[in-house]
Every structure is written in structure tokens, then in C-alpha cells.
């Protein structure tokens, strides 16, 4: 059996989890080949959850961080399919827990995407980076928000509190450290007293909670914190937001707030709101609130992608917070008027080209006239030469004395007198008639 066949059989045995077959094939010299997608035997064993097969392959020396055509490692495969025991085996054998595939997604991203809570906990336990961002600028926390998985959200938030993002990957990260407290969970339609909420937060932050630490986050939706500040009527302004007061509601634009807050997600059961301030602890908000300033309960709801805080009728009006836009619209700048200049330049270019073409046409016509005159002149000369030849031919009589001179190579001219010529003609006439002179002999008739 060839090596290629042995490699194919090894891939199939790893896919099916046939440990004995894998050992036999490796003993017979089967190479660690891959299929057309770059999938190795360890990839297949990790994908299909064959623990013993993966262990045999690792002991045999298969690369624990082998890459497919899309840069996925065996750890990616195991995490995506929820095989926690395979994940732990790979990590213990030195697999890169923060390896990224072609989409820049780590094993933690894939485990969060597929709702594998046990794999998420295991990866965080072995030091997975919870601040890593994918190609789409999403962390594992962002994916959990999209998937509405509250359990994984809490796990990731605790891990984010315990980790410090030394090298943020987003385009505009916040460089100032921010304080973060535990998440507040609001049930659908629940009425919460804001004063008690802030006091409980202040108690947690000042009591030295070991889960609270300094972390860094990027700019995100900030409308809820802006609403809290508006309700508190803080003396210290927290933003440069433009507020338009109406009789029954006040709208605060989210893009004018300088704080950070993660998105509010819910699946009909709970709403998870994570509030983060830019270096301003929540205790400072409480100190800036007048005594008895917040005694009104409020309701947190989500309507059509907007976060709405509804306050009962009283001193504080109902407020609707518009979701912060990611990009601020830049003012329109006046474009320079270059249309007229461009048109004039194009017209001048067209005029120059037209003049050049006319000049070339005139030059061509002039040359054609010259050639025509030259041709007529040549025809006239040829006609005159033909007439001369005809006249010469008519003027030559038969038997008249003539002079014929021909060039003979390497022979001097022969002079023949008229008497000698007559004698020769007489001799020849009697026998054969008239004889023409030699064509290559120069003859001249000289009168005696």
C-alpha cells in the first residue's frame, strides 16, 4: 500500500475514532497528511469528539496547532462543537488558546457563538483573552449580546473585570481606565428605585469587592448613563449633550455623551445593562445628587432598538434616549467651483486639436497638389521623348551612309574606309547578299 493510501486511511480512522487502526497505520509508516481542506487527523478527532484518538495522535507527535485552509486549529474545532474534554486535552498539551483563524476569531469566540458555556468557562480558566476582537470588530462579549445568552454574558463580564486589556485592538480604544461594577438585571416591566440602585452600587465599590477591578472599554452606546445623569440633575455636567425640553419628554442624543455602556439585550425574560463611566465612579453620581432628588421609580424598556426610561408623572418628565450613532455626520464642505474651469480647459483643448487637424489636412492637400504637378510634368516629358524617338525613326533612310559606333570590351575601334567597305560589300553580294557588321565590333565609315 502506498503512502498516499496510508494517509487517507489514517484520516478516515481518525474521523471514526478507531484507535487501534490509527496505531496500526502509524506503525506501518502512515504519514500525517491532510485532505483538500487542510484538515489533519487531529482536526477530525477534535471535531468529532474522539478523546482517546486525539490523545494517541498527540503522543505520536501530530502538530497540536495545525492549520486548515481557513487557519482553524484543532482547538477551534473542539470549541465550536462543544467538546470540553478535547479542549482541555489540547490546552494541557500546549495548544495556543488565543489562536485566531482567517476571521480572526479565537476558540472563545466560537464557543460563545455556539452557546457552549462549559467550554467558555474552561477557556477562561486557561487564560483565553476575553478582549480579543474578530475581523468584524466583535469580542466574545459582543457575540454573547447578539445571541442573548445571559449566562455567558455574566461569565465574560466577570472575566473582563479580572483581566486588563493591555493592547486594545479596536480603532479608537478608550485609554483612560474605567471602573465597572457588577451587572444589574432588570426584568421586563420591573420598576426600580434609582436611588437605591446607586447606593447599592456605591456600597459595592467602596467595600473593596475583589471582583471589581480597573478595566478598559471602547466607546459604545451611552444613552442610559446620560438619562441617569439627567434624572439626577447633577451639578457637574457629564457631557456636552444638546437637550431640548418639552412638556412631557426630553430627548438626549446618544452621540453627545462621553461615557461608555454596552448594548442592552433581552429575550423577553431579562434585560442586562452594563453601565461604565469614563473614569467617574458611580459613587460620584450619588454625591452630586441633591438630597431626596431621586425618589421616583423608573421603568427600563427597549422599543425598536431604542432604550427608553419611563418615569411616572411628577417633577421628572418622561425621557426617551436615542441610540448613539456610531459615526457623527460631518458638516458639508463647499466644493470649489471647478466645473467652469474644467469646461473651458476642455473646450480649449478641443479647439487646439481642431486647428491642428485642419493644418494637417491643408498640408496633405498641398503635398497632393505638388505630387500631381510632378506627375503631369513627367508625363509631358515622356510624351516629348516618345515623339523624338518616332521622328528619329522616320528620318533614317535605307542605304544612306551612317556611322555606327559600338563599344567592344577590350578591343580598340576599327577604322574602315569607304572603299574597303564597298569592296567587301561587292564580294559578299555576289555570294550571299548583304552581310551585317559584327555586333561587338566598333566600325566607323571614313570618306577617302
Swiss-Prot record:
Name the major location. nucleus
* Residues carrying Phosphoserine: 256
SMART domains from the UniProt entry: ANK (SM00248)
Say which species the protein is native to: Homo sapiens
Superkingdom classification of source: Eukaryota
Q: What is this protein called?
A: GA-binding protein subunit beta-2
Localization in the cell: Nucleus
Q: Outline what the protein does.
A: May function as transcription factor capable of interacting with purine rich repeats (GA repeats).
Gene name, Swiss-Prot/TrEMBL: GABPB2
Which residue ranges have biased composition labelled Polar residues?
428-448
Biased region (Basic and acidic residues) positions are: 337-354
Instruction: Provide the residue span(s) of the region labelled Disordered.
Output: 325-354, 420-448
SUPFAM superfamilies linked: Ankyrin repeat (SSF48403)
Pfam families in alphabetical order:
Ank_2 (PF12796)
Q: Which residues form a coiled coil?
A: 345-395
Which Gene3D superfamilies does this chain map to?
A: Ankyrin repeat-containing domain
Q: How does it assemble?
A: Heterotetramer of two alpha and two beta subunits. The C-terminal is necessary for the formation of a heterotetrameric GABP-alpha-2/beta-2 complex, and also facilitates homotypic dimerization. Interacts with ADGRB2.
* MF-aspect GO terms: identical protein binding; transcription cis-regulatory region binding
UniProt keyword annotations, A-Z: ANK repeat, Coiled coil, Nucleus, Phosphoprotein, Repeat, Transcription, Transcription regulation
Amino acid at each position: 500500500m502506498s503512502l498516499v493510501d496510508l494517509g487517507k486511511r489514517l484520516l478516515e480512522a481518525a474521523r471514526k475514532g478507531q484507535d487501534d487502526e490509527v496505531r496500526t497505520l502509524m506503525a506501518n509508516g502512515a504519514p500525517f497528511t491532510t485532505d483538500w481542506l487542510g484538515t489533519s487527523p487531529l482536526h477530525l478527532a477534535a471535531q468529532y469528539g474522539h478523546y482517546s484518538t486525539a490523545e494517541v495522535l498527540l503522543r505520536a507527535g501530530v502538530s497540536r496547532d495545525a492549520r486548515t485552509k481557513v487557519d482553524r486549529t484543532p482547538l477551534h474545532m473542539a470549541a465550536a462543537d462543544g467538546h470540553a474534554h478535547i479542549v482541555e486535552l489540547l490546552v494541557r498539551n500546549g495548544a495556543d488558546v488565543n489562536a485566531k483563524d482567517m476571521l480572526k476569531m479565537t476558540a472563545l469566540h466560537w464557543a460563545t457563538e455556539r452557546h457552549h458555556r462549559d467550554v467558555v468557562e474552561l477557556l477562561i480558566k486557561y487564560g483565553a483573552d476575553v478582549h480579543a476582537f474578530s475581523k468584524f470588530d466583535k469580542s466574545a462579549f459582543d457575540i454573547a449580546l447578539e445571541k442573548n445568552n445571559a449566562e455567558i454574558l455574566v461569565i465574560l463580564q466577570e472575566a473582563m473585570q479580572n483581566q486588563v486589556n493591555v493592547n486594545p485592538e479596536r480603532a479608537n480604544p478608550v485609554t483612560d481606565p474605567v471602573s465597572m461594577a457588577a451587572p444589574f438585571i432588570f426584568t421586563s416591566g420591573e420598576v426600580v428605585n434609582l436611588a437605591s440602585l446607586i447606593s447599592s452600587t456605591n456600597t459595592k465599590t467602596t467595600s473593596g469587592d475583589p471582583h471589581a477591578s480597573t478595566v478598559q472599554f471602547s466607546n459604545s452606546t451611552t444613552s442610559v448613563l446620560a438619562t441617569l445623569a439627567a434624572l439626577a440633575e447633577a451639578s457637574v455636567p457629564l457631557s456636552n449633550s444638546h437637550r431640548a425640553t418639552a412638556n412631557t419628554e426630553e430627548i438626549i442624543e446618544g452621540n453627545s455623551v462621553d461615557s461608555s455602556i454596552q448594548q442592552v439585550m433581552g429575550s423577553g425574560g431579562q434585560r442586562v445593562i452594563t453601565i461604565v463611566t469614563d473614569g467617574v465612579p458611580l459613587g460620584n453620581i450619588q454625591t452630586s445628587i441633591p438630597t431626596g432628588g431621586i425618589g421616583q421609580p423608573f421603568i427600563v424598556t427597549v422599543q425598536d432598538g431604542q432604550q427608553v426610561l419611563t418615569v411616572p408623572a411628577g417633577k421628572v418628565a418622561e425621557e426617551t434616549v436615542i441610540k448613539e450613532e456610531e459615526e457623527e455626520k460631518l458638516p458639508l464642505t463647499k466644493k470649489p467651483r471647478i466645473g467652469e474651469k474644467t469646461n473651458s480647459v476642455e473646450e480649449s483643448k478641443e479647439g487646439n486639436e481642431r486647428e491642428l487637424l485642419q493644418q494637417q489636412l491643408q498640408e496633405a492637400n498641398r503635398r497632393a497638389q505638388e505630387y500631381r504637378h510632378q506627375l503631369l510634368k513627367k508625363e509631358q516629358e515622356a510624351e516629348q521623348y516618345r515623339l523624338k524617338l518616332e521622328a528619329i525613326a522616320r528620318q533614317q533612310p535605307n542605304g544612306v551612309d551612317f556611322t555606327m559606333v559600338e563599344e567592344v570590351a577590350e578591343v580598340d575601334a576599327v577604322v574602315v574606309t569607304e572603299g574597303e567597305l564597298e569592296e567587301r560589300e561587292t564580294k559578299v553580294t555576289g555570294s550571299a547578299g548583304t552581310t551585317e557588321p559584327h555586333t561587338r565590333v566598333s566600325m566607323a565609315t571614313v570618306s577617302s
